[in-house]
Amino acid sequence: MDLKEKIRIIDGFPKEGISFKDITTLIGDGEGLKASIDMFVEYLKDKEIDLIVGPEARGFIFGVPVAYALGAGFVPVRKPGKLPGETISVNYDLEYGSDSLQIHKDSIKKGQRVAIVDDLLATGGTVEGVAKLVEEAGGEVVSLAFLIELIDLKGRDKLGDYDVISLTQYDI
């Protein structure tokens, strides 16, 4: 299935000059959602994944069903103040500023094999921060998997030697 046929493009959102990739049309379509999950699983199934890590919020949409299909656990990555237990944090740079993300300190055990699943690879800043969190917790980042990659933003270049896959690619 061509997933691009299920992703709506909205020009001028959230501001002029942006061509927004709206995944709500894909996840609202049973065949499209199933196909995207199946594609992630097909890529990751032989990588001996212990945990799927997903950044909020759209990483949850894809990460949980992929974890289920692989028989792996799921670790949510949240903004500060959203997790009730003891956390570890990472600050990461955005195009215009910085942000922070957290996971529970005990959510990843030393040596666990981790795939990070998210909806979008743009500049790579968010996923680079998530990978640092995983490694700080003792996990091994085995793969970074995205529904969409905006290739002109060169996020893949920022991610060095990590194994990166994207199910669809767009020029911006």
Curated annotation (Swiss-Prot):
What are the protein's UniProt keywords?
Cytoplasm, Glycosyltransferase, Purine salvage, Transferase
Where located? Cytoplasm
Q: Does the keyword Cytoplasm apply?
A: yes
Q: Name one GO molecular function term.
A: AMP binding
GO BP: any one term: purine ribonucleoside salvage
Main localisation: cytoplasm
For the protein in the UniProt heading, the enzyme class is: transferase
Tell me a GO cellular component.
cytoplasm
Q: Which reaction does it catalyse?
A: AMP + diphosphate = 5-phospho-alpha-D-ribose 1-diphosphate + adenine
Q: What EC number(s) does this enzyme carry?
A: 2.4.2.7
Pathway(s) served: Purine metabolism; AMP biosynthesis via salvage pathway; AMP from adenine: step 1/1
Q: Does the keyword Membrane apply?
A: no
Q: Which InterPro entries match?
A: Ade_phspho_trans (IPR005764), PRibTrfase_dom (IPR000836), PRTase-like (IPR029057), UPRTase/APRTase (IPR050054)
The entry's family comment says: Belongs to the purine/pyrimidine phosphoribosyltransferase family.
Note the subunit structure.
Homodimer.
Function field: Catalyzes a salvage reaction resulting in the formation of AMP, that is energically less costly than de novo synthesis.
Annotated protein name in UniProt:
Adenine phosphoribosyltransferase
Q: What lineage does the source organism belong to?
A: Bacteria, Bacillati, Bacillota, Clostridia, Eubacteriales
Q: Which gene encodes it?
A: apt
